Amino acid sequence: MNDRQAALDQALKQIEKQFGKGSIMKLGEHSDQNISTISSGSLALDIALGVGGYPRGRIIEVYGPESSGKTTVALHAIAEVQAQGGTAAFIDAEHALDPAYAKNLGVNIDELLLSQPDTGEQALEIAEALVRSGAVDMLVIDSVAALVPRAEIEGEMGDAHVGLQARLMSQALRKLSGVINKSKTIAIFINQIREKVGVMFGNPEITPGGRALKFYSTVRLEVRRAEQLKQGTDVMGNKTKIKVVKNKVAPPFRIAEVDIMYGEGISREGELVDMAAEVDVINKSGSWYSYKEERIGQGRENAKQYLKEHTDIRDEISKRVREEYEIDGSSKEPLDEKEETLSLLDDE
């Protein structure tokens, strides 16, 4: 047994000498066994994700129909990263980012890194350079469907380019996945949906870009509008369902229901009223909502308005709800501690 252990120790020393310290270790020796996360900017989504937010160093795919709220979900995450002192980058392959809307959601547009690349190859090379720097906490690519290969742009209309985009994504993700993990960057890929022709049974919907992104993603979120939110006859927003269809760090298939209001994004007060009522932090009796035996509004909209006006009570309720769901942020790391990450990337 001692000979076997000595041989193993010798092999480990050789591996570390050849590939660098930390290239192999016992799992129990790893200093951080908890999953480090950054809040999604939505309490309901943090709870649905099971770990209190997006896991750092992982790939996230957000997909759904047009105008369902995919970019809104990503922009809320960027705002949360910036609020914690982190750096975020947005690769706008669709050339459709609205800076005024992003600002309304809490994004610091003066500090947001923005790229509007001409080709898919250029977009993914920029993404790789940003991730390899080790200085970017969140990278959003909007969208995979708009990552057009160079050959397609330079070709004629009507030319067939079978599988080009899928091959591009497959190669890019092979290169990116390892360095994303080492740099602790959260990479959010926004994707659209398409329909297969001639599917008689089952779901005909597919996401563009091949299968690679499905495999490499730690979390996949499906965003869909459920119903319109009206004030009188005016449509003020949409009730949106965000389904966690894949999750490698917690149980999947949980659903977060949020109100996405036009011009404002996700209503924090709306989801807080729903989640607090679910765990009896807020009491609901008939149409009345009350907190600590004090009535805060008749009907959901009035309760939302009360919390909007009384931010101290809103923050207190939010803290209690997070404690009830055990997502008090204990696994989070400071975003400005980059020295170890940078040294790991320099070793490459």
Curated annotation (Swiss-Prot):
Keyword match Zinc-finger: no
PROSITE patterns: RECA_1, RECA_2, RECA_3
Family matches, as InterPro entries: AAA+_ATPase, DNA_recomb/repair_RecA, DNA_recomb/repair_RecA_CS, P-loop_NTPase, RecA-like_C, RecA-like_N, RecA_ATP-bd, RecA_C_sf
Residues given in the record as ATP binding sites: 64-71
A Gene Ontology molecular function term of the record: damaged DNA binding
Biological processes per GO annotation: DNA recombination; DNA repair; SOS response
GO cellular component annotations of the record: cytoplasm
Protein localization: Cytoplasm
UniProt keyword annotation of DNA-binding present: yes
Biased composition (Basic and acidic residues): 325-335
Sequence segments annotated as region (Disordered): 325-348
Keyword annotations from UniProtKB, A to Z: ATP-binding, Cytoplasm, DNA damage, DNA recombination, DNA repair, DNA-binding, Nucleotide-binding, SOS response
HAMAP family: RecA
Membership in a protein family: Belongs to the RecA family.
Function of the protein: Can catalyze the hydrolysis of ATP in the presence of single-stranded DNA, the ATP-dependent uptake of single-stranded DNA by duplex DNA, and the ATP-dependent hybridization of homologous single-stranded DNAs. It interacts with LexA causing its activation and leading to its autocatalytic cleavage.
Protein name from the UniProt record: Protein RecA
Organism: Listeria monocytogenes serovar 1/2a (strain ATCC BAA-679 / EGD-e)
